[in-house]
Amino acid sequence: MQKRELIYEGKGKKMYATDDANLLIAEFKDDLTAFDAQKRGNEAGKGALNNKISTQIFKILKEKGIETDLVETISDTEQLVKKCEIIPLEVVVRNIATGSLTKRLAIKEGTVLPFPLVEFYFKNDELHDPLVTDEHCLVMGLVKSEKDLQTLRHLAREINSILFKFFEERKLKLVDFKIEFGMDKDGNILLADEISPDSCRFWDADTNEKLDKDRFRQDLGSVKVAYEEVLRRILS
C-alpha cells in the first residue's frame, strides 16, 4: 500500500491518502496536548503505544460485532483504515464523575454514576467543542436523522458495556472515554479514530492511580510508563 499526501493532521494523528481511494493511513504521533492545546508536550514512544492499545481494543470490539474503520496495523505507529466521513461529534461515555462533569454539575469527584452517561460534543476547536443536545445536532445538521443519533447512543453504550467488563477483569476502572464515528461510502456508521489512554480515563482498581493522559494534564509523571501498564493489562 503506497502512502501518499498528508490530508489531515490532528492533535494525536496524521492521516495520509493511499493509492486506494477507499483506504487511508493513520499515523499516531508522540505529541501530547491538553486544555485546548494550550499545554503541549512530547514523549517518545507514546504514539506507538497508542497504536498498539487502540488496535487491540478495536479487535476486541470487532469480535463482539462492533464495526470499525480498522483494516490492519502496518507499522509500529501506523494503521490502514477505511476512508469514512467523520461525524462531527465527540461521543463521551462517563461511568465515574471526574473532569468537566464535576465542574459543570458540582458532582463529587469519583462518584459512581447510577448508569453510563452519554454526551455529545460538537467537534469545533474555535468553539472549544461545546456540549450539544440531540436537537442541536439535528438543527445544525451534524447528523442526518434522529435515527443516526439513536444509533450513536446505542453503539456508545454497547462499546462501554463490552470494555467496562473487559477492563474490570484486568483491575482497571474505565472512568470515561471519548469516541468518534464515521460513515462509509455505503452509509454504514463505523467506530473510527482511536480508543487509547489519550481518549480514555483509566484508574487502577485498587489504588485509583491514573493511567491515562491526566498524568500529562496534572503533571503526575510519565505518560509512557502508564500507557505501557495499560497495554500490559490488555494483553494479560
UniProtKB/Swiss-Prot annotation:
One Pfam family assigned to this protein is SAICAR_synt
Recorded catalytic reaction(s): these are: 5-amino-1-(5-phospho-D-ribosyl)imidazole-4-carboxylate + L-aspartate + ATP = (2S)-2-[5-amino-1-(5-phospho-beta-D-ribosyl)imidazole-4-carboxamido]succinate + ADP + phosphate + 2 H(+)
**Key word Nucleotide-binding present:** yes
Q: EC number(s) on record?
A: 6.3.2.6
Q: Name one GO biological process term.
A: 'de novo' IMP biosynthetic process
Claim: Magnesium is one of the keywords in the record: no
Q: Which residues form a coiled coil?
A: none
One GO molecular-function entry = phosphoribosylaminoimidazolesuccinocarboxamide synthase activity
Q: Which Gene3D superfamilies match?
A: ATP-grasp fold, B domain (3.30.470.20), Phosphorylase Kinase, domain 1 (3.30.200.20)
Q: Name the keywords, alphabetized.
A: ATP-binding, Ligase, Nucleotide-binding, Purine biosynthesis
Q: In which pathway does it act?
A: Purine metabolism; IMP biosynthesis via de novo pathway; 5-amino-1-(5-phospho-D-ribosyl)imidazole-4-carboxamide from 5-amino-1-(5-phospho-D-ribosyl)imidazole-4-carboxylate: step 1/2
Query: Which leading EC class covers this enzyme?
Result: ligase
Protein family membership: Belongs to the SAICAR synthetase family.
Q: What is this protein called?
A: Phosphoribosylaminoimidazole-succinocarboxamide synthase
- This chain's source organism reads Campylobacter curvus (strain 525.92)
